[in-house]
Amino acid sequence: MATKQHQDAPTPTRPKSTNGIINGTKASVGDPRVVVIIYGQGQERIVAVFADVLGKPYRLAARFSEVRGDDQGTVVGIAVGDAKADILSRNRVLLVTINAHCVALGMPPDVDLSAASDYEFLYTESPFFRRDLSRFIAFTLGQISHHEELTTKPRTYFISTTFPDVRTALSNLDILSVGSDAVEIRVDLLREPLPDGSFNPVPSLSYVGEQVMLLRQRTELPIIFTTRCTRENGKFPMDNPELFYQYLYRAIQWGCEYVDVEIWLPEEIRHRLFEQRGNSRIISAFHDFSGTFKWASPQAQTIFDESRKYGDIVKMITIINSVSENYELEYFRSQIKANNPEGPPLSAVNMGQLGQLSRSLNTVFSPITHPLLPIVAAPGQMSAAEINEALSTMGQLPKKNIYAIGSFRSSPQVTFFEKCFNELGLPHNFTSVDRSGVRGSIESFCHQPGFGGAYLSPALPANQPYIPILSDAARTIGTIDTVVVRGEGASASFIGDNATWKGIRATLTRDFAPSAYQDRAAIILSHSPEDAAPIIFALRSLNIGKMYSAGFKAPGPLAVGVEPFTSIESLQRVDHPFAIISALPSGKSHLVHPLLRHFSSTSRRSTPTIERKGSGGKGKVFLDLANGPRQSDPLAVAEQHGWTAYGVADTSAFTTVETLRLLIGQNVPYSFVRLASGPGLY
């Protein structure tokens, strides 16, 4: 089975995903094709897990020709041995094929099936592997996308793992990735050991695939897949461009969010990868180490024009000989931005110590390092903290006072935010203020010199006269939990936003793709419409179906599609709710127990059994937002009755991630929030 003959046909263009973007735009339905899972010997249960994550039924088939249009909305599993018979003749318009391979079996995946499939999911049956599966399948099917959200950020960064084996980095990855919006795996720096004690000159696809799998298991950040050649400070040989294609195309199949493609590669290969990129994004990369490249020359514009042909982001990296060339780059950057308002965005820096100014001024995917990394990926690379300190020195990052105003213990809050600010090298002060002790209104804080924003707990009503601008989420939900400052001095404006709903949605999609919620029923319990509003908004962003309320009346526009429980009879009309979310006070949280028992699922298991057909999609989610001492543990009750259960600590940590993005414009991963906050904060 020749590799090239089944790689030339591009994956059909996926629908544009909007799940990641701000202001509550609904999750994309994604790729409408029938999902076919190729499974290994004895691994049939992976089909049921895929179905559960997607919220769909499943069945097993003997060959691709048995899968027809009436399988729409069903996950179909085909065994490895059977799939080989007719995978090349499958209907690509009707089917999207994923080769699911368990690396714990001790053998690499079938090379021909890997190349012939649309995507490949490598996994180990670890306790949380379905979270990796959820992220993988939601991304590859176009239900989520990070790129649209990242393009709206004022600054984005990525960190490169320069380890010969990513296992070395995993223990420190929570700290390494603070401030990063993506993590790069440098495939050319990987060293695959051979039985004789030497190393493979080029790491095999199976070894690289496992390294990508390990990285995905330990970070929620998008992955940038890079194979740097010898001429561009890398180790991949340049004598075989088709070798680059094989690895870069496989990165798309593995669901890497970004794929770095060097522009020296033949145009035919770059064009092929761009057409086949699916939901991945191509970084079209140019590097010059000669020292002769000039930003003011016509060559610079020519390289940009060539790069943009097959790139979602253009990256240009050069060596310079004088500090003045940094200013030439800034002029070039301004011209590109002015002449290309629709993009693609330009990431451009000068290498070496002389070029560090350009690293501070670049705003698109600036490559950063960290003191814990063994080597820097390029000369002159800086950490996120060093860039922020440089920006502060230049007056581009003025010192601000950021507040937490509410009813919470100040000591853990201040300590945690100080950890974040120190790790990021930010000059800001953070103060926690008990609202009950505040003299005057919150407005007085907003008008203080150096006010840099605040987050509020409990949230404020959205109709505050001193906060004239509201996000769509805050306006619809009716409350503000974050005050964001845009601009400086007299021209500064205050924007009211709501981060809580994003924390709720992030929690709900940890183990399930957004499609699992589509048109399904949900039950919400709350004593307050204000507490229920962000829950309703989050569920609606996931295309939820009917919502049932208990203990509150849904406010305003959020009331559409929400039916209150008024009697036992109304409860009995609810058929298999997919989610139950309780915002009851901790002293009342036990009231949800009867619902959890009544709607218990006996088919929901951590390791589903497999039959020729299965209902799938019967997974159920319970989220308890109560904070404080309880009479009993509703999470334990939920898990005993087959629910996937989450507590307020999960949602609070995800909400903190979103709050920090709003207040300081930088990314602090969920894993670091949980690590650094300790038991005293949540």
Predicted regions and their residues:
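Alpha/beta catalytic barrel-like cores
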Residues: A2-I223, T227-N233, M238, Y247-Q253, ...
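Adenosine-phosphate binding glycine-rich loop
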Residues: A513, G616-Y682
